[in-house]
Amino acid sequence: WLVALLGMATKYAECLLAVKYRVRDKYGFMAGGPMYYIERGLGIKWLAKLFALFGVLVAFFGIGTFPQVNAITHAMQDTFNVPVVITATVVTVLVAMIILGGVRRIARASAVIVPFMALGYVTTSIIILIVNYDKLPAAISLIIQSAFNPQAALGGAVGFTVMKAIQSGVARGIFSNESGLGSAPIAAAAAQTKEPVRQGLISMTGTFLDTIIVCTMTGLVLVITGAWSNPE
């Protein structure tokens, strides 16, 4: 939750700057992001190029693709016994059809898929929480106790436990909302708006909904159902 609050401020700043320093490319689309406001705002061209290079590498080989596809393929294999190769091929084809259509097709696909995806996920989570409402207090208590386990206080280990809890929370929070990573500003720069401040405010709500609302519900569902202690 703390990461979400700090991330909201970060997301606001980076998306505001993305709209403020964006440019129109030769195809007529708005392009922006950290590499643009680093070059046009700070005037450090070499750093902007370096960010763009590492941004491409991360998008291709890092958190931009591998974790998501890995989660989908293994979920299909574990739940429906669908071979990983088949699921990966289908995902690749579908994603290629959307990406090759450019920014507009990506926006249209996101406008259709994301609302239904989010609504279905949140609705299912709420139903599970309502059905198991009597377990909510114990689940919340377990989450808090697990973060600061008093049994780990032997030999000064409590400091290490707190440190690991913070590291884990920060890593998962940033991975979830992407605040400060530079990916969100690239998308925000393509927004059809002339108000950088407004876009910054809109972008920061995504961090709140994703990390504070959705991640909290996910954690409670995992604890209530016992899935956290029995991944299978």
Protein language model annotation of sequence segments:
Residues 2-10, 47, 53-66, 205-217:
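Membrane-embedded alpha-helical segments of transport systems
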Residues 18-24, 98, 173-178, 183-196, ...:
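Helix-loop junctions at the membrane interface of multi-pass solute transporters
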Residues 33-36, 70-71, 182-191, 221-223:
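Re-entrant/interfacial helical elements at transmembrane boundaries that shape
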Residues 2-31, 92-93, 224:
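Juxtamembrane transmembrane-helix boundary signature
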Residues 15, 19-60, 80-81, 204-207:
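Transmembrane-helix boundary/entry motifs in multi-pass membrane transporters
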Residues 69-76, 83-144:
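Membrane-interface loop-to-helix entry segments
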Residues 14-20, 124-142, 150, 154-157, ...:
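Extracellular/periplasmic helix-exit of transmembrane alpha-helices
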